[in-house]
């Protein structure tokens, strides 16, 4: 039976951490460890983590940014399959890990992903787009793989080199592109997780910086040649113009 490590990075996550913990603890699949990497919380986050039932590990005062924290979590973990579920996110039902384990058991997949809903002030919203069929060229046009709904075999994660600590926002996108060059993933058009959108979340509070870093990652991985360069630059300019028209979350 495959074992799973769910890695949760936290920093002053008290308003949301209980829901995250409960969603992991409620999973019916038996072989799960929950690994917490805390960046030095000064609220009640650590106290809540220490009360977590089941198989847990935690480390505190981890510095160096979110990419480093996620890599530290992998080093601390022992599961055959790795997933990251941040302290303000949560699984949608108690069969998520059982479903994922079944897909791994019945395929040669090295990694897989499902879908997420957005949680805005407690209300859940499903995306208004269809999950595309996976291809590396499609992924290079834009990241459609949601980190809270992605699961990676340990061997594949280590072979990929882990998260780039030089990235603050697009470290997951960069990892997907490197993993895709090792092995294509299995994509499941099923909802696994909820991603909370609030002013304190890094990707929400710094949407423009995250967008620019996404583009830098895309340039890093795109094919050589003038045509790919012009194609991706055109996509970048179009999306940048659209992003400038969106209201900011306050």
Predicted feature residues:
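Catalytic core of nucleotide-sugar-dependent glycosyltransferases
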Residues: 195-198, 204-229
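Membrane-proximal basic amphipathic "stem/tether" segments
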Residues: 219-250
């Amino acid at each position: 039976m495959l074992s799973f490590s769910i890695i949760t990075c936290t920093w002053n996550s008290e308003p949301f951490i209980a829901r995250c913990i409960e969603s992991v603890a409620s999973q019916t699949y038996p072989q799960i460890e929950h690994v917490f990497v805390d960046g030095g919380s000064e609220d009640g986050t650590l106290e809540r983590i220490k009360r977590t039932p089941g198989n847990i590990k935690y480390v505190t005062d981890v510095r160096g940014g979110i990419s480093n924290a996620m890599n530290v979590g992998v080093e601390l973990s022992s599961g055959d399959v790795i997933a990251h579920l941040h302290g303000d996110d949560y699984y949608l039902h108690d069969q998520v890990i059982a479903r994922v384990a079944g897909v791994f058991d019945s395929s040669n997949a090295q990694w897989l992903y499902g879908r997420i809903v957005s949680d805005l002030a407690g209300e859940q919203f499903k995306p208004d787009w269809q999950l595309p069929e996976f291809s590396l060229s499609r992924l290079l046009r834009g990241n459609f793989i949601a980190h809270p709904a992605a699961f990676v075999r340990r061997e594949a994660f280590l072979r990929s080199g882990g998260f780039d600590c030089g990235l603050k926002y697009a470290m997951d996108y960069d990892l997907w592109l490197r993993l895709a060059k090792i092995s294509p993933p299995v994509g499941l058009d099923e909802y696994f997780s909820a991603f909370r959108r609030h002013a304190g979340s890094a990707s929400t509070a710094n949407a423009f910086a995250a967008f620019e870093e996404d583009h830098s990652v895309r340039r890093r991985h795109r094919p050589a040649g003038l045509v790919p360069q012009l194609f991706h630059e055109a996509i970048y300019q179009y999306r940048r113009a659209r992003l400038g028209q969106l209201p900011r979350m306050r």
